[in-house]
UniProtKB/Swiss-Prot annotation:
Keywords: Mitochondrion, Ribonucleoprotein, Ribosomal protein, Transit peptide. This is Large ribosomal subunit protein uL29m. It comes from the Eukaryota. Pfam families: MRP-L47. It comes from Aspergillus terreus (strain NIH 2624 / FGSC A1156).
Amino acid sequence: MHRHSVLRLARQAGGLPLVELPPPYLAPSLHFSLIRSPVQSSNFSSTTPVAGHGRDLSKSRGVSAIHRTGPKFKLGVSKYPLPKPVSPEALEKRNPTPDHGLWGFFPKDRQALSTPEYDHAHGRSWSIQELREKSWEDLHALWWVCVKERNRIATSNLERERLKAGYGEYESSERDRVIRVTQNGIKHVLRERWYAWEDAQKLYKDGYRPQDEE
């Protein structure tokens, strides 16, 4: 199709949309003249007033994880300088405390992982009848001995799992079971004493006096 024919057809139809115009290889001059503006919108110049880009509002300009480029200015993580590591030779020597209370959470050999022989060497649990004869101070002390021993067993179990030792699990679980039986007995005795105190308080409010029976 000739260019003049396309222009005449477009003027008669009041202007055809781009989808109805012929393809570029049939009318290249017409196609490019309709798409591109014949007038240049801005003057090209390499001088400083015209070629300046102005203020860059993008804060991430120049940051690329692929090319390992960072921002244009330094970023501080803190207003205080980072501490410098000290060599082990410059550190002050500390003498260990042989009788420190935290050693009670470890076996006698002071190792994080107890041996199966150590966990297996234990006695039976306290019976309820034996605990009934104990005072409040004795029960309180025995309870915290059980708590500390169970803490030590839990530490050994965690270390055994971390090292994947593959032994000592049965002995430690059996020792922990015996300790839990003792703790349940202590709670049972304290519960009995609480009920006895409530009953005695109720009888006293009702007017009962033991000396009146004599």
